[in-house]
Amino acid sequence: MRALTRDPDKHRELAEEVIEADLDQPETLKAAFEGAHGVFLVTNFREKGSDEFKQATAAVRAAKDVGIQHLVWSTLPNVEAISGGKFDVPHFTGKAKIDRIVKEAGFPHHTFVIAPGYYQNFVGFLAPQKQADGSMGWALPLDPGVRCLHMGDIRELGDIVAGAFAHPDQAGHGEYLPLIGDFLSFNEIIETLNGQGHTFSFKQVSKEVFAAFFPGAAELAEMFGYWEAHTYLGSDSSDRIALANKIAGRQPTRFSTWARVNVPIKEAV
């Protein structure tokens, strides 16, 4: 077993073979990929100082140079193209613009997987906050009645990735495979949670008001606007979702099931 890390000296115990691999140091990637059949490539937009396009381009080139047979790239919808330039969501569009690099690289097989809006966000950056009226809930620039959130348990994305590697005949020719456990409006999310014993509230605020809440909120306001206008995936993706579930060999966890375990009542008080 081979483990990849940016600092192999600190992690020698991880595997029989521990190799340095740093997306910001392309010279480390060939040794990391050498001898592998496939590569699952993910970049992190939020990492300070990272350049996703540069990182992914270098990784794709290295994978091609050492003869990788199947590259699976973790992408997101191209908000710029879908919205005709109306919305600017770099952490979506930046990944989508790498799709062309993957397609043109000439791998025997390549696949695109699409991570959902994480259920885990509801105990992270989207966790309910105390509101001015004393309730716990959300104040977002989003119509809560619009069904637009394609969501899932991010821990299940690996089922789709593994399935793509196992079934290149079905999912190795540029197919897009989204992990979607549920497709809900924010009202439906709150109804689900409150039906489990919570008393969460929701207030719709303007994009301008939300943008002033905290650093980085302006981009999130753009994202919410895009979701409301076009949904998270941006198009009718029922066929892609069905194929992803078939490739994974299972149905993804529904939001209500996840929330019952992961958003206990004690977190609401």
Give each language-model segment a name.
Residues 2-14, 24-34, 41-54, 61-70, ...:
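Oxidoreductase cofactor-interface core, primarily capturing Rossmann-like NAD(P)-dependent enzymes
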Residues 172, 207-269:
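A hydrophobic C-terminal alpha-helical subdomain
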Residues 21:
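Cofactor-binding loops of NAD(P)H-dependent oxidoreductases
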